[in-house]
């Protein structure tokens, strides 16, 4: 009588187990590979922010928002973030300051330093002048432009390295009732007036300059007129373009069926696909000092500052360490 060898079925079972274990779900175990594929598709995309590679690769390949329920607020689908380190150099900046002239900017709700009420336009004009003059003292090669936004967008002051030239256009402004916010028109104007630098190697060669847009915005929540065109997408993906925001909102919680200022703030934040922009929100009925503090934090050079979530403005991380830390020269 012949007896079958016990090893034969065991080997077949092992092979079946190996084959059944091969198809595994996609994981985040290789974020570097995912980033390499993204870099090949978008060679000009860049970011010097850190600690966000895995989260970015997890979102890759899911641009569709059809699974979400019907909602009137349309937020652009999140784009995959690509981590490319840029040289942390203090190269010249071309700063385009965009000032909202909606009627909300003229409401006397902010608390000034002496306790009286003032409006956001008055405080914004002062903090913009202080910002421009301070940046000019840091580096006289910085250039500044002023754009005002109501129903339309107007380029008041061209790029100049003379702060007096911009400040001469800053104070003769009037607010108006605005029905819409043409965000697409604003970015299209910036693209027409500005040339974005290109380098042979983003990671090692410093750019001749960087372009930064600072939007001071104050309106009730409303869906902006905006569609992400291909030229606009390239602008946001450019490693030398930065979009900073100071959003002055009413601070009130709207009803559930209405749009909230938080929705608008999230919408503006979703435009930054590199994680390099800074965004601040200030209540319209709060102290004016908060607006000044936001503008002071924007003085840092975009290539030298960390991502906003890592930024710290305290001298000491822990109050308990105050007695242990000594200044050394």
UniProtKB/Swiss-Prot annotation:
The modification Phosphoserine is found at residues 8, 29, 49, 57, 62, 66. PANTHER family: BRISC AND BRCA1-A COMPLEX MEMBER 1. The modification N-acetylmethionine is found at residue 1. Residues 95-298 are annotated as: VWFA-like. Coiled coil: none annotated. CDD domains: vWA_BABAM1. Component of the BRCA1-A complex, a complex that specifically recognizes 'Lys-63'-linked ubiquitinated histones H2A and H2AX at DNA lesions sites, leading to target the BRCA1-BARD1 heterodimer to sites of DNA damage at double-strand breaks (DSBs). The BRCA1-A complex also possesses deubiquitinase activity that specifically removes 'Lys-63'-linked ubiquitin on histones H2A and H2AX. In the BRCA1-A complex, it is required for the complex integrity and its localization at DSBs. This is BRISC and BRCA1-A complex member 1. The modification Phosphothreonine is found at residue 65. Belongs to the BABAM1 family. It is found in: Cytoplasm; Nucleus. Its main location: cytoplasm. Residues 10-19 have a biased composition (Acidic residues). Keywords: Acetylation, Cell cycle, Cell division, Chromatin regulator, Cytoplasm, DNA damage, DNA repair, Mitosis, Nucleus, Phosphoprotein, Ubl conjugation pathway. GO terms for biological process: cell division; DNA repair-dependent chromatin remodeling; double-strand break repair; mitotic G2 DNA damage checkpoint signaling; positive regulation of DNA repair; response to ionizing radiation. Component of the ARISC complex, at least composed of UIMC1/RAP80, ABRAXAS1, BRCC3/BRCC36, BABAM2 and BABAM1/NBA1. Component of the BRCA1-A complex, at least composed of BRCA1, BARD1, UIMC1/RAP80, ABRAXAS1, BRCC3/BRCC36, BABAM2 and BABAM1/NBA1. In the BRCA1-A complex, interacts directly with ABRAXAS1 and BABAM2. Component of the BRISC complex, at least composed of ABRAXAS2, BRCC3/BRCC36, BABAM2 and BABAM1/NBA1. Identified in a complex with SHMT2 and the other subunits of the BRISC complex. Residues 1-86 are annotated as: Disordered.
